Amino acid sequence: MNSQEKLLKTVVRPHVSDKTYGLSDANSTIVFEVARTATKQDVKSAVEKLFEVKVESVNILNVKGKARRFGRVEGRTKAWKKAYVKLAEGHDINFVGAE
């Protein structure tokens, strides 16, 4: 796997919710779902290279899978990893494409 593939596999997708929308407006923090094996340094370099922005800090947390029932069978949803990426002042990521 070359470095470009690793960058694309590190950041899975942006995590969009009311809380993350408020964070992005208030203090330019973007939330991503990232690979389970990703470290803070991996996420920082991937975001800086993919979106051409300057990252100030990265906080990562593991989200446990929730217990669910599938008919009579008890199971769990998949666990995943979330990264809070704080961008440097003057930098922004525009996912919609509108100016």
UniProtKB/Swiss-Prot annotation:
PROSITE patterns: RIBOSOMAL_L23 (PS00050). GO terms for cellular component: ribonucleoprotein complex; ribosome. One of the early assembly proteins it binds 23S rRNA. One of the proteins that surrounds the polypeptide exit tunnel on the outside of the ribosome. Forms the main docking site for trigger factor binding to the ribosome. Part of the 50S ribosomal subunit. Contacts protein L29, and trigger factor when it is bound to the ribosome. NCBIfam families: PRK05738.1-3, PRK05738.2-4. HAMAP family: Ribosomal_uL23_B (MF_01369_B). This is Large ribosomal subunit protein uL23. It comes from Francisella philomiragia subsp. philomiragia (strain ATCC 25017 / CCUG 19701 / FSC 153 / O#319-036).
